[in-house]
């Protein structure tokens, strides 16, 4: 008999039911559980798959460049970035009638097109690309790179090129290479691109391969660098009336510290950005030479960790045993990497709008909204993944003997205190925030809005003031002309920064009031509750009072049979599953807040947010309902407009979201009966009964149905909000 899918599991491939297919798909990437898997092969498979991942990323970005070059309007957009709408790609749809063709023909195109809300036009323009030829060249280069990575992935699975286990376990070498090579040298290379290509282009000087070696990025060349007079590179920066892309008002400085924004593009000064990347490069290249490898000099991470013992002895053995625990657990490493990446992704969301790096992106409101929302959702999924792999570490990789009385063991010993504190914080935040909102709702309903409880966020306003925001009247640090911080930065970056932070047309340190205070605490409630769920799941993953032997059951189990009927819903997987709902819920509040605050800022009616955000009906009526009107009118009996695709996506998103509940609020027996009825009918229907299946159809397991339900809930939720966000923003601002 031919071996059936899945080839990696003898047991599953012999399963006579459809469970074989579902469980095969579910465990395809759980390499550890595959037949004949050794630790070395596990590392090699994961290593090779990284090349595949990189190939896919480069293929995707190559496709972005190619389609814009082929079907976009990059050159026309570059002539007038504020008024031409950037085209992502053409739409070919045989269903389009004449009204649809007309509605979607925009941005100077000859047929229906999609508008780009990703910010790639602004990015490419800022880094010095100007023509379609530039885009094609970039696409071709990335395509070649993609092929190269596929070959490298294949190569590293060949016997002669497979790295051994000791190579993967060599943490110091990997850290040195990643710090110096990945971060350091690539930052240096990027500085080089900015200085040699992007900055000259922003000043109207076209540098390409033909004149790269002859065009001086700075009039004095390398002279100041070699003679140690580095400050020369900061002199004569672009003036405040510089027209981006032209020599009008341009300077010659290449590494500056001006602070604030370029007045015309509303983005950070390109010369400040180059300086930043150079500094990062220097720091990381040095950092990548700190760890001990073949030469017997430098730090040993293991020695550093072993030395980290808290003084006084009351806090246990600190970091003893951590090196081997982390170095031998891929789940621990992945958990750490995902936690760091999740935080960074959320920081990217926060910084992309408040300190825009790309020319003219701040005036493209829909793109700003889309990028913020996109990065916050990505951050949410990455963070839940971090907690999931942390829990898997405790179940599969944690060794109590190796970690006696160190920080990990003490976390587990203190789990009651940790979980109960998180629970208390969530309850406190939830009841108080909801109490304030509901009180304010009732006061408005009774016609006495002056009786609302409105709390000024004085601490947050004070923090904004320390950074130089003068509005609140706090005389402190950067908002006080007498402070040493103020005088120290006066000749450098401070004037530009103060100008930016006190300018009401950008998003830097937005003015905050009672509505912000409330929604801030609502978000804090969401964050603490979301955190408490997977933290409890991970800390209880090895065992709890209710189920001391839980780790024997693995990461995901539905229940432990009728004998212990109270053991349903307590696997670490269930904690992950529940936390994703709360994560989506929290990010919903975050993005609602960001979007509404910005819509009123961009429309010049901030009073609407200030007055309506202090009670729930304000959010429902003046944000959600008011802004979904264009969406619901995407098409109606009188025809359609260019928002109709978002209207359809809005409806479709709701449908997918609702289907999620079909899997979430429904039990296995019902499905098993239904499937058997359908199979019976199928086998007795002429023509249909010519198609038979080898596997006996069985319903999804409880855990699988939850996964399918969760996937539909998440996808539907995101589709619905994406359509709302893009339609409501682009409908207002074009």
From Swiss-Prot:
Membrane topology: Multi-pass membrane protein
Any one Gene Ontology molecular-function term assigned to this protein's record: 4 iron, 4 sulfur cluster binding
Keyword Cell cycle: no
UniProt entry keywords in alphabetical sequence: 4Fe-4S, Chlorophyll, Chloroplast, Chromophore, Electron transport, Iron, Iron-sulfur, Magnesium, Membrane, Metal-binding, Oxidoreductase, Photosynthesis, Photosystem I, Plastid, Thylakoid, Transmembrane, Transmembrane helix, Transport
Binding site residues for [4Fe-4S] cluster: 559, 568
EC number, UniProt record: 1.97.1.12
Entry binding sites for chlorophyll a B1: 654
Quaternary data: The PsaA/B heterodimer binds the P700 chlorophyll special pair and subsequent electron acceptors. PSI consists of a core antenna complex that captures photons, and an electron transfer chain that converts photonic excitation into a charge separation. The eukaryotic PSI reaction center is composed of at least 11 subunits.
Functional note: PsaA and PsaB bind P700, the primary electron donor of photosystem I (PSI), as well as the electron acceptors A0, A1 and FX. PSI is a plastocyanin-ferredoxin oxidoreductase, converting photonic excitation into a charge separation, which transfers an electron from the donor P700 chlorophyll pair to the spectroscopically characterized acceptors A0, A1, FX, FA and FB in turn. Oxidized P700 is reduced on the lumenal side of the thylakoid membrane by plastocyanin.
Protein name as it appears in the record: Photosystem I P700 chlorophyll a apoprotein A2
Organism for this UniProt entry: Angiopteris evecta (Mule's foot fern)
Gene name for this UniProt entry: psaB
């Amino acid at each position: 008999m031919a071996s059936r899918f899945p080839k990696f599991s003898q047991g599953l491939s012999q399963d006579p039911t459809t469970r074989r297919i579902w469980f095969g798909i579910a465990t395809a990437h759980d390499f550890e559980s595959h037949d004949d898997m050794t630790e070395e092969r596990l590392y090699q498979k994961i290593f090779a798959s990284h090349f595949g991942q990189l190939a896919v990323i480069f293929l995707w970005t190559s496709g972005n460049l190619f389609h814009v070059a082929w079907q976009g309007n990059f050159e026309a957009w570059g002539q007038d970035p504020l008024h031409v709408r950037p085209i992502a790609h053409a739409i070919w749809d045989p269903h389009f009638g004449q009204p649809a063709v007309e509605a979607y023909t925009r941005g100077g195109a000859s047929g229906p097109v999609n508008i780009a809300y990703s910010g790639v036009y602004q990015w490419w323009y800022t880094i010095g690309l100007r023509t379609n030829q530039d885009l094609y060249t970039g696409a071709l280069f990335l395509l070649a790179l993609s092929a190269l990575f596929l070959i490298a992935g294949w190569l590293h699975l060949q016997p002669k090129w497979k790295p051994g286990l000791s190579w993967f376990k060599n943490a110091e070498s990997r850290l040195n290479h990643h710090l110096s090579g990945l971060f350091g040298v690539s930052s240096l290379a990027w500085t080089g691109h900015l200085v040699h290509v992007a900055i000259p282009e922003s000043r109207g000087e076209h540098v390409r391969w033909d004149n790269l070696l002859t065009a001086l990025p700075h009039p004095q060349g390398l002279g100041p660098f070699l003679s140690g007079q580095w400050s020369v590179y900061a002199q004569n920066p672009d003036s405040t009336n510089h027209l981006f892309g032209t020599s009008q008002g341009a300077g010659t400085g290449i590494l500056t510290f001006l602070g604030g924004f370029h007045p015309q593009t509303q983005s950070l000064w390109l010369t400040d950005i180059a300086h930043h990347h150079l500094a990062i490069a220097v720091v990381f290249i040095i950092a990548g030479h700190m760890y001990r490898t073949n030469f017997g000099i430098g730090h040993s991470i293991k020695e550093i960790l072993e030395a980290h013992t808290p003084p006084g002895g009351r806090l246990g053995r600190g970091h003893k045993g951590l090196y081997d625990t982390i170095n031998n657990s891929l789940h621990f490493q992945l958990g750490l990497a995902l936690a760091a990446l999740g935080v960074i992704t959320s920081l990217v969301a926060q910084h992309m709008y408040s300190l825009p790096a790309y020319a003219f992106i701040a005036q493209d409101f829909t793109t700003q909204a889309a990028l913020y929302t996109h990065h916050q959702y990505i951050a949410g999924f990455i963070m839940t993944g971090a907690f999931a792999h942390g829990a898997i570490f405790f179940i599969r990789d944690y060794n109590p003997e190796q970690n006696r009385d160190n920080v990990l063991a003490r976390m587990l010993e203190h789990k009651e205190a940790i979980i109960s504190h998180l629970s208390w914080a969530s309850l406190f935040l939830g009841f108080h925030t909801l109490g304030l909102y509901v009180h304010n709702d009732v006061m408005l309903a009774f016609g006495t809005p002056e009786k609302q409880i409105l709390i000024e966020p004085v601490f947050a306003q004070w923090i904004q003031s320390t950074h130089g925001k003068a509005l609140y009247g706090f005389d402190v640090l950067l908002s006080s002309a007498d402070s040493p911080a103020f005088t120290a930065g006066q000749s450098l970056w401070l004037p530009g920064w103060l100008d930016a932070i006190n300018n009401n047309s950008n998003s830097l340190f937005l003015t905050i009031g009672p509505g912000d205070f409330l929604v801030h605490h609502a978000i804090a409630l969401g964050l603490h509750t979301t955190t408490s769920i997977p933290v409890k799941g991970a800390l209880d993953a090895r065992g709890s009072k209710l189920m001391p032997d839980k780790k024997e059951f693995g990461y995901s189990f539905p229940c432990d049979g009728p004998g212990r009927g109270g053991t349903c819903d307590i696997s670490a997987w269930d904690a992950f599953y529940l936390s994703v709902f709360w994560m989506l819920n929290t990010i919903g509040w975050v993005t609602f807040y960001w979007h509404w605050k910005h819509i009123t800022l961009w429309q010049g009616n901030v009073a609407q947010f200030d007055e309506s955000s202090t009670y729930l009906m304000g959010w429902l009526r003046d944000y959600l309902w008011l802004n979904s009107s264009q969406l619901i009118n995407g098409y109606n009996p009188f025809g359609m407009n260019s928002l109709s695709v978002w209207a359809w996506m809005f409806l479709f998103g709701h449908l997918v979201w609702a289907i999620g509940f079909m899997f979430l609020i429904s039990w296995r027996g019902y499905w098993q009966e239904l499937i058997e009825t359908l199979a019976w009918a199928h086998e007795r229907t002429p023509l249909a009964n010519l198609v038979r299946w080898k596997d006996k159809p069985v319903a999804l397991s409880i855990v699988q149905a939850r996964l399918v339900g969760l996937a539909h809930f998440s996808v539907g939720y995101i589709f619905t909000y994406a359509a709302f966000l893009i339609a409501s923003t682009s409908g207002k601002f074009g």
